[in-house]
């Protein structure tokens, strides 16, 4: 608009530029392995166990807030594998522990992580075993048992005290939780689990429970 109130149009020259950008996509697992320290990478592998918008933000563990179960009156059925009652007794002695200390610090973490696998590894460590030792169910625990020929699927019928039991809560094919087998009465499997609602508890499940992913079979 000019001084007399008349509108007019003016063409103003300008320069413009086109920016061509090439983007490279990398999976987060690749970035993690490149940028994280060994301790951070191990923690990341633990966190990967639970994915998506779930009650457990990070993986490993059970959201079960129910009380520990009573084994009074349970009649266990012995299979052909001997198992190890001593490691079961060690695990049972920790029932009532809340928060997972000393299990995650024994493993080497400086702060709390989801600690079900640390608990199982700690129990084996108290027996003088250096292996199996794992903080992640899916990426460390199961591969160890499979690579040593010590893996049994959900329908494996000869579990023994001291075996590891792995769970897949959301049935996505990845193990989310692990505990120690106390024994079976022929229809149910009884366990001691760390990080079950952030506590050590005795639990039991039908042997056909669909969330049982399989068993790590210990050779004593």
Regions found by a protein language model. Give the residues of each.
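Short beta-strand segments
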Residues: 8-10, 177, 200
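Active-site signature of cysteine proteases
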Residues: 187-220
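N-terminal capping segments
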Residues: 54-129
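Generic short beta-strand segments
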Residues: 1, 97, 166-168
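Non-catalytic propeptide/linker segments at domain boundaries
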Residues: 5-78
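Surface-exposed intrinsically disordered loops and tails
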Residues: 2-9, 147-150
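...with weaker cross-activation on analogous glycine-rich loops/strands in unrelated enzymes
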Residues: 130-198
């Amino acid at each position: 608009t000019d001084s007399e109130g008349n509108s007019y149009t003016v063409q103003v020259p300008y320069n413009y530029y086109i920016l061509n950008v090439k983007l490279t996509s990398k999976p987060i697992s690749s970035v993690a392995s490149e940028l994280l320290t060994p301790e951070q990478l191990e923690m990341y592998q633990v966190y990967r166990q639970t994915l998506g918008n779930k009650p457990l933000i990070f993986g490993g563990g059970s959201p079960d807030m129910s009380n520990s179960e009573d084994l009074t009156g349970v009649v266990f059925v012995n299979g052909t594998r001997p198992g190890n009652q001593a490691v079961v007794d060690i695990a049972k002695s920790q029932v009532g522990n809340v928060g997972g200390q000393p299990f995650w610090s024994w493993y080497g973490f400086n702060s709390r992580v989801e600690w079900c696998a640390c608990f199982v590894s700690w129990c084996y460590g108290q027996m003088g075993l250096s292996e199996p030792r794992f903080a992640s169910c899916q990426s460390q625990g199961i591969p160890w048992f499979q690579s040593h020929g010590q893996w049994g699927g959900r329908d494996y019928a000869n579990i023994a005290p001291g075996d590891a039991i792995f769970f897949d809560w959301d049935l996505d094919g990845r193990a989310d939780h692990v505990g120690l087998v106390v024994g079976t009465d022929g229809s149910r499997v009884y366990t001691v689990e760390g990080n079950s609602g952030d506590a050590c508890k005795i639990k039991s499940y039908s042997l056909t429970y669909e969330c049982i992913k399989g068993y790590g079979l210990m050779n004593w």
